[in-house]
């Protein structure tokens, strides 16, 4: 019977390629430090694709992103640290991320240079200034992505969304783009192995490099006009329901 895990050589090769990618990326992070938005977006896309390629991770876009202007608030379900690379590879933006990521190698610096807003999830006092900062970023025409679950899940369902940060889209009169992320193994079944909901980053990374094949599917589900929502709770509900429907679509074949 063949193993459902990658060989030790494959795991080692992936880790080596990731190390090389981290080293090269660390030397070229200035490419996403401010400057021309088009140049920054190209650099962010290249970083996202490079990280996934180093780990042999496939990326598929199901429902494509609709035509829309810049300055969009992007809301997605949160499964893994790979989410940021997958989304960056197909839809470059700034991110709202937990404070801890700021100290991560490369990813933290990449986030800082790309305009990521780092938040303390345990402090409600951060919400108002963060919404103000995100609103200003949206009004400048820059896209901002965030994970309204506020923490990672298994990826086979959704945790309840938080409404607070949707206020920035209402204040800016911006569109909100709903994105669903799903992870598949070598058999085409949904998998929770890339999730770091219950493990640390090193264990999660080892799980990922140990998989024979991993594919991330990105679906751009719908666009909501924040100005048409009664309040941030109604806006949150609309986005949450649309993402939940896609995430739950084939979760029954998960392994």
Swiss-Prot record:
Cystine residue pairs: none
Intracellular or extracellular location(s): Cell inner membrane
Keyword Cell division: no
E.C. code: 2.3.1.51
Reactions that this protein is recorded to catalyse: a 1-acyl-sn-glycero-3-phosphate + an acyl-CoA = a 1,2-diacyl-sn-glycero-3-phosphate + CoA
GO biological process per UniProt: CDP-diacylglycerol biosynthetic process; phosphatidic acid biosynthetic process
Topological category with respect to the lipid bilayer: Peripheral membrane protein
Family annotation (SMART domains): PlsC (SM00563)
InterPro entries, A to Z: AGP_acyltrans, Plipid/glycerol_acylTrfase
Sequence motif HXXXXD motif, location on chain: 78-83
Pfam families to which the protein is assigned, alphabetical: Acyltransferase (PF01553)
UniProt keyword list: Acyltransferase, Cell inner membrane, Cell membrane, Lipid biosynthesis, Lipid metabolism, Membrane, Phospholipid biosynthesis, Phospholipid metabolism, Transferase
Highest taxon in the source lineage: Bacteria
GO MF terms held by the record: 1-acylglycerol-3-phosphate O-acyltransferase activity
Pathway: Phospholipid metabolism; CDP-diacylglycerol biosynthesis; CDP-diacylglycerol from sn-glycerol 3-phosphate: step 2/3
NCBIfam families: AGP_acyltrn
Domain remark text: The HXXXXD motif is essential for acyltransferase activity and may constitute the binding site for the phosphate moiety of the glycerol-3-phosphate.
Homology family: Belongs to the 1-acyl-sn-glycerol-3-phosphate acyltransferase family.
Function, in words: Converts lysophosphatidic acid (LPA) into phosphatidic acid by incorporating acyl moiety at the 2 position.
Full protein name: 1-acyl-sn-glycerol-3-phosphate acyltransferase
Organism: Neisseria gonorrhoeae
